[in-house]
């Protein structure tokens, strides 16, 4: 019986690398996979999943308006789909999570989702919230803070290198804008940013 998996982490834990390896494993056995990534993520070439170690794969794009369930079923009618892999799944909506649950339950296709658990404020993304609630399997992919502890938070920085603790949830960027840290160093950076803001008023 197919299951819905949520592989989550902070940034730079190898989520895309893990997705690409899983897709390769299916393909090597002659099985067809569908790979999705978020249209909003413009860090790399559009229509591709790219890993920091240089691996890449073509991908179907999704926006918040995409009916992923219908798209998967149409592809499955053309040629059997053995597994669906979704990168940047934190950008999925509640309705889209419901759609992929139905794909798993009624079409018997495993769905592997890879994404961030929380944003730079430490708050859940909508997609992550419902995957944490509804996925059959939750798998944490680990990365480390500069101190060596497990990194479970993401800091966002402004153009001058100062930590930011408010603003829009989505602001696409890479290592120049975000860094994964442990809770202790996240709180220290945020408290310092709040202190500096207060001092400048």
From Swiss-Prot:
It catalyses: thymidine + ATP = dTMP + ADP + H(+). It is an enzyme of class 2 (transferase). PROSITE patterns: TK_CELLULAR_TYPE (PS00603). GO terms for biological process: DNA biosynthetic process; thymidine metabolic process. GO terms for molecular function: ATP binding; thymidine kinase activity; zinc ion binding. Keywords: ATP-binding, Cytoplasm, DNA synthesis, Kinase, Metal-binding, Nucleotide-binding, Transferase, Zinc. Pfam families: TK (PF00265). Gene3D superfamilies: 3.30.60.20, P-loop containing nucleotide triphosphate hydrolases. Coiled coil: none annotated. It is found in: Cytoplasm. GO terms for cellular component: cytosol. InterPro entries: P-loop_NTPase, Thymidine_kinase, Thymidine_kinase_CS. The keyword Lipid metabolism does not apply. It comes from the Bacteria. ATP binds at residues 9-16, 87-90. Its EC number is 2.7.1.21. Belongs to the thymidine kinase family. HAMAP family: Thymidine_kinase. This is Thymidine kinase.
């Amino acid at each position: 019986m197919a299951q819905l998996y949520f592989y989550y982490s902070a940034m730079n834990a190898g989520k895309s690398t893990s997705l690409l390896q899983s897709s390769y494993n299916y393909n090597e056995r002659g099985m067809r996979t569908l790979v999705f990534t978020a249209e909003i993520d413009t860090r790399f070439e559009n229509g591709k999943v790219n890993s920091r170690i240089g691996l890449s794969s073509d991908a179907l794009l999704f926006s918040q308006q995409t009916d992923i369930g219908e798209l998967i079923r149409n592809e499955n009618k053309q040629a059997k789909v053995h597994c669906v892999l979704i990168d940047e799944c934190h950008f999925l909506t509640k309705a889209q999570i419901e759609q992929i649950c139905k794909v798993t339950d009624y079409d018997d296709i495993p769905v592997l989702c890879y994404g961030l658990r929380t944003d730079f404020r430490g708050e859940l993304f909508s997609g992550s919230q419902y995957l944490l609630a509804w996925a059959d399997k939750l798998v944490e992919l680990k990365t480390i803070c500069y101190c060596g502890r497990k990194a479970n938070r993401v800091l966002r920085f402004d153009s001058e290198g100062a930590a930011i603790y408010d603003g829009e949830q989505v602001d696409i960027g890479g290592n120049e804008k975000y860094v994964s840290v442990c809770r202790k160093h996240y709180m220290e950076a945020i408290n310092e940013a709040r202190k500096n803001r207060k001092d400048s008023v």
